[in-house]
Structure formats: C-alpha cells, structure tokens
Amino acid sequence: MNIGLRASVRRKRFDEHIKTNIGFTAALRIGSGAKAADGNGEYFMVYVFLAEGFEEIEALTPVDLLRRAGAEVRTVGVGSKNITGAHGITVACDMSEDEASASIKEAPEALEMTVLPGGMPGTLNLGKSETVSHFLDAAAKRGAYIGAICAAPSVLGAKGLLRGRRAVCYPGFEEKLTGAKIENAGVVRDGNIICARAAGSAVEFALCLVSALKGERAAEEVRHAIIAQ
C-alpha cells in the first residue's frame, strides 16, 4: 500500500471515529498514523485555516503534499465550513472553527502545525479570527510549527511572532512583519516558523513544511514523486 493510500485510509478512520461519541482524544489516537518522535504512541495533527478570499494554490498545495508525506491534515473553515477562494473555487473544509478549537482543547498535545495561506481578503479574514489567534498562541507556546505564505505572514507580524526572526512575505507587506528580518528568498525557515513569498513559492513552501514534520528524506521523496525541480 503506497503512502498516499495509507494516509487516505487513516483519514477515513479518523473521520469515522469523530462521528461517533467516543471523544476526540480517543479518535485522534485510533484514527491517525503520525506518531510522535518520542515513540510514546501520541498522534499529531496539521491544521490549515481557510477564510473567504484565500489563495487556492497556497492553501491546497500544502494540504496535498503534506498528505502525500503521510501527515494528518485538517482544513478548518473560518466562519463556515464551505469557503470560497479568491478565484472562485469553493472548498468543503474538514472542520469548523468550533470543532478545531474543541479538538485542541481535548488534546492540546496533538497540535503539530498551523498553516495560513495568503490571498485577499482571505488574509484579512484570518487576522480577524479569534480561533486563528488562539491556535497561533497555542502553537507558539508549545513550539509547534507555524507556516504562513504570501500576505499571511502579516498575521504573525501583528501578533509579534516574527520579532527577531528571519521572514519573507508578498512584496508590499514587509512593514506589517513587525520586528522581522526580511530576506530576499522564496521560502524562509527560522526555527518553528516557516514563511513564503507568494503563490509561485507554494510547492517549495509545502516541501519545507514536509521537511519540518517528516524530515528531509520524506520531502525529497515527495519532490521526486511530483517531479519538482
């Protein structure tokens, strides 16, 4: 069974258990296959937040490549579970904000990564979300990974998460990355925070997320599978 099929099977099991009343924590441990590095059998989750007007490539490329690498990924709709992107593509998200919040309330150790795509007005809507803010606070507190691309690093900047960090964003948003050390690059990783410039950097951004979660070998396997340069 290939890695993509295994991940698909795990997601199906996860969702089936969520629909029962056995509790999120139990479902998370039964339905997911991504084990913690400490080998204690704990399971982790990646949350990708989508708000009205999000940039589709920047959101779905990370979802696709992370799942190819075997990561457990859930899309979270801000304001609704059906979210329409900047170019008219509507996505039926896996979770509502309330469901996502409940999931980390019951299993805070499951928060492995939070990802914010850019796009307009998607980025502005992400910045207004209390749920997104809560997830970023929780991720920063526990040292979980945070990924943001295009205009979305401005959401991190507004929360002071980029002070003293190397970062990059869509041209023109630099002043919103308060305290950051702006670099001229497509993708920049500084510790647990990964930023990318724009839609054209979506594949490299996603591969960097894979590398952070699963290691460079996994990222290279995905790169080879999609024939990325």
Question: What would you call each of these model-derived segments?
Answer:
Residues 75-77, 146-150, 165-170:
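Short, hydrophobic beta-strand segments that form beta-sheet elements in well-ordered domains
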Residues 30, 34, 39-142, 155-158, ...:
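Extended, subdomain-level signal for the structured scaffold at the beginning of enzyme domains
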Residues 3-18, 23, 28-39:
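N-terminal polybasic/positive-inside topogenic patches
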Residues 1-3, 23, 45, 74:
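Accessible peptide chain termini
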